[in-house]
């Protein structure tokens, strides 16, 4: 078995599939939609309309680059407030046209730059949490790599949340956790064990609903799960969908 910190390394691997690969493998006719309609565009959030087995859906997710230069342009998948506002715009559009939403989460966290703070990063994330919680269309979120902090949570308020088996999901990086707790980022491996950030540990807490295996059959299994769960969720009326989502999040955690 791999250690938690080994899984962190796998989740961060530059060769892991990106959102563009998932779109190519799972959907047909993807059309990208850009801009937050407030004058800005953030490429670290990719979103648009596609068909899933003939069903119109909205796809939204974090976008990482395939090389260092592209990653710098995309802030390594760390979205700005403009990116989250774009995601919210697309989600509201999906609600208007009764399209299910499928989110792909892969980010170290929200972009921490000065401009992001000045443009309202905390508020944008909070607005996203509130809006996704009240959407009247099905939402499925899949953590495919790094699920870091509020940057990941902003696209993780969903009716179903799944993780790939080698993905991680946490309040912050193990290096940051170690630096805060022990003033020593070199103890990241130790911190990652305490944080219970692996897919199997997160599943035990009830935060996620399933773990998807990786390997040759990964896309086929993901397709089967999406077909099954969308079939169930699209049969629910709007009131039941929102109420069910509310109860789901009220029941998470130990008190």
Per-segment meaning from a language model:
Residues 18, 66-69, 111-113:
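Short active-site-adjacent helix-start/loop capping segments
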Residues 32, 93-96, 110, 134:
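Alpha-helix capping at helix-to-loop junctions
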Residues 105-227, 235:
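Conserved catalytic cores of soluble enzyme domains
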Residues 4-6, 18-26, 83-90, 103, ...:
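General structural feature for long, well-ordered alpha-helical segments within catalytic domains
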Residues 25, 29, 39-41, 47, ...:
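Glycine-rich beta-alpha loop segments
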Residues 1-57, 61-64, 76, 224-255:
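Intrinsically disordered, low-complexity segments enriched in small/flexible residues
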């Amino acid at each position: 078995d791999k250690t938690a910190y080994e899984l962190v390394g796998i989740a961060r691997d530059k060769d892991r599939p990106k959102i563009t690969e998932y779109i190519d493998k799972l959907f047909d006719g993807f059309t990208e939609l850009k801009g937050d309609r407030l004058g800005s565009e953030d490429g670290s959030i990719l979103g648009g309309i596609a068909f899933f087995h003939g069903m119109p859906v909205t796809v939204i997710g974090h976008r990482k680059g395939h090389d260092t230069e592209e990653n710098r342009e995309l802030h390594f998948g760390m979205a700005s407030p403009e990116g989250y506002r774009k995601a919210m715009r697309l989600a509201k559009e999906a609600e208007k046209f009764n399209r299910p939403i499928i989110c792909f989460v892969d980010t170290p966290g929200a972009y921490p730059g000065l401009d992001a703070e000045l443009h309202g990063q905390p508020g944008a994330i909070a607005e996203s949490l509130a809006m996704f919680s009240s959407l009247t269309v099905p939402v499925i979120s899949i953590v495919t790599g790094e699920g870091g902090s509020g940057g990941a949570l902003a696209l993780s308020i969903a009716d179903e949340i799944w993780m790939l088996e080698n993905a991680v999901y946490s309040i912050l990086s193990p290096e940051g956790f170690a630096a805060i707790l022990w003033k020593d980022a070199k103890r990241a491996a130790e911190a990652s064990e305490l944080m219970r950030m692996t897919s199997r540990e997160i599943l035990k807490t009830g935060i996620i609903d399933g773990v998807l295996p990786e390997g040759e059959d990964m896309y086929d299994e993901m397709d089967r799960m999406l077909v099954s769960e969308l079939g169930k969720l699209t049969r629910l009326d709007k009131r039941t969908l929102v109420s069910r989502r509310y109860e789901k999040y009220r029941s998470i955690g130990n008190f």
